[in-house]
Amino acid sequence: MNTYIPEGYKSLLGVYDTQKAIGLLKRLFEDQLAAKLNLFRVSAPLFLEEASGLNDNLNGYERPVLFDIPQAGKEAQVVQSLAKWKRMALHRYDFYPGKGLYTDMNAIRRDEDVLDNLHSVYVDQWDWEKIIESSDRNLDYLKSTVMDIVAAVCDTQRTMRAIYPQLQVLPELERQVTFVTAQELEDRYPDLTPKER
């Protein structure tokens, strides 16, 4: 495992306050995001019945963690991705255009290629999905959604900085978003690969 801690790093909060702050940050951000995007919290499954077909295999080679449930006579898989499950949940909960869900997924990805500060076998990830009208499938709606997400992040940071003055030393996030299309990047950097751009 390749973890990296920058030289001279010192935590701004003690261990207890760090855990307390993480919990608060999650609650604040959930509330901000839900309000700005009209989302409702839905609990995500930890595992799914193998036969349901709702567990994504992500990139095609990752193997889910499997186990049997003898009392039910079923095979189950630890969730790897909620992409299919979220769409099923939108239908099951009778969501309508303009309304969506968010969830906190916990997963085990046993075939993770690289283990480091950002990649782990254990995944704790927020996810959201929203039903939109066909007329909303456009660049303006996408940009507006991005701006709402950035506002949720910035509003959360502002509150955290007010509650924990020690965080004032960190740079304040910018609300202004610069949008760049893939075509603009290709025009500007034609000799670079898409990944390098």
Tell me the role of every PLM-derived stretch.
Residues 122-162:
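Long, contiguous amphipathic alpha-helices that act as assembly "spine/axial" helices in icosahedral shell
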Residues 148-197:
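Metal-assisted phosphate- and nucleotidyl-transfer catalytic regions
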Residues 32, 145, 188:
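Residues that form generic nucleotide/phosphate-binding pockets
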